[in-house]
Structures are given as C-alpha cells and as structure tokens.
C-alpha cells in the first residue's frame, strides 16, 4: 500500500547550503520532518550545482518520512549569471543594464527545458527572452 501524503512543500535553497536555520528548519520542523536528514540529503545532491538557489519540492508522508525533487536553477539566476549582473533593472523599459546573446538564451532554454511548460525549444527560448526583457537585459545576435 502506498504511503499517505500529508503535505507538499516548495522551497528555494542555495545549492549545498541547506541548514536547520530559517527558512528550512521552521518549515520542516512544524511538519515533523527530520531536518538534519533532509539537509544532508539535499546538500549531497546539490553540492556540484554552484552557488545557485535550487527549487526543491518536498513531499511529506504520514509516517514523517519524505522524498524530494530538485529542479534546475531559476531562469532569472541563469540570466543574471550570463549577463554578469547582480540584479535586474528597476525600470526595464528605460534602463537596459546588460546584454546576452541569442546563443546564451538558447543554452539557458536547453538547461531549463524540463522545468518550463514549453512544448518546443522555440517556445522555451521565447520564455527566456521574455524573462530577460523584463529584467532590462538586451538580447543581441
């Protein structure tokens, strides 16, 4: 018989840096999950992912056990790294703060393809281009 799911939790945690302090500790503690067990498993799985924030979907079962799925870093983090900036523009229509090439956009789209709700690579590229524009980043050839 399958275990009964009592909750699902979505978090963004820096790769390889999960620890019992907020926001991880309180979120897991109030659901009765073994915090250190999760932190060790998450850090082991994400130790090679750089310094990105990693989205994680944690499924908690009635016996307080859990499973989790790690996803790729957010598109905005990948765009910021490609453009070499710290944050997006406060006024993206007037202030362009960086440039990325179409090749970089295609690479980001290929990386995120499984997490995006796009049916084709072209659709994924358009999603990434839209995110870049809303951050004040120009796309050049």
UniProtKB/Swiss-Prot annotation:
One or more lysine residues are methylated. One of its GO terms (molecular function) is structural constituent of ribosome. Keywords: Methylation, Ribonucleoprotein, Ribosomal protein, RNA-binding, rRNA-binding. InterPro entries: Ribosomal_uL11 (IPR000911), Ribosomal_uL11_bac-typ (IPR006519), Ribosomal_uL11_C (IPR020783), Ribosomal_uL11_C_sf (IPR036769), Ribosomal_uL11_CS (IPR020785), Ribosomal_uL11_N (IPR020784), Ribosomal_uL11_N_sf (IPR036796). One of its GO terms (cellular component) is cytosolic large ribosomal subunit. GO terms for biological process: translation. The keyword Transcription regulation does not apply. Signal peptide: none annotated. SMART domains: RL11 (SM00649). The keyword Iron does not apply. Coiled coil: none annotated. It holds the Pfam family Ribosomal_L11_N. CDD domains: Ribosomal_L11. It comes from the Bacteria. Part of the ribosomal stalk of the 50S ribosomal subunit. Interacts with L10 and the large rRNA to form the base of the stalk. L10 forms an elongated spine to which L12 dimers bind in a sequential fashion forming a multimeric L10(L12)X complex. Belongs to the universal ribosomal protein uL11 family. PANTHER family: 60S RIBOSOMAL PROTEIN L12 (PTHR11661), LARGE RIBOSOMAL SUBUNIT PROTEIN UL11M (PTHR11661:SF1). Forms part of the ribosomal stalk which helps the ribosome interact with GTP-bound translation factors. This is Large ribosomal subunit protein uL11. The gene is rplK.
